[in-house]
Amino acid sequence: MVRIEAVYDGNLRCSATHIPSGQTLVTDAPVDNMGKGQSFSPTDLLATSMLNCMMTIIAIAADSRELDVSGMSGSVEKHMASGPRRVSKLSLIHI
């Protein structure tokens, strides 16, 4: 179990703390959704989580085969839809 605590800071911005490590991240609503766009949006983190999860799983598999994947990089595109506003597609560009 991992506990994460979040606080709404106002102005469509939230701070979330990963309790085991004490690390905090901030989300901000994007400009096209009434925010300032000064940080990752919650849906940006959804796309980031998918990409980072895939790269982590690849690294775990590589480590078990004694392969070095240091420097591996990837890219994902997030597509949004409206009515209701939602993520419509996550496109993995490359790993």
Model-derived regions: residue spans:
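Helix-adjacent hinge/juxtasegments
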Residues: 59-76
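N-terminal presequence-like segments and the immediate start of the first folded domain
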Residues: 1-41
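Compact, glycine-rich, soluble single-domain proteins
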Residues: 42-61
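Conserved small/polar residues in nucleotide/adenosyl-binding loops
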Residues: 93-95
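A short, glycine/Asx- and small/polar-enriched loop/turn
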Residues: 83-90
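Glycine- and acidic-rich phosphate- and metal-coordinating loops
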Residues: 74, 90-91
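Beta-strand elements of well-folded, non-transmembrane domains
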Residues: 10, 78-82
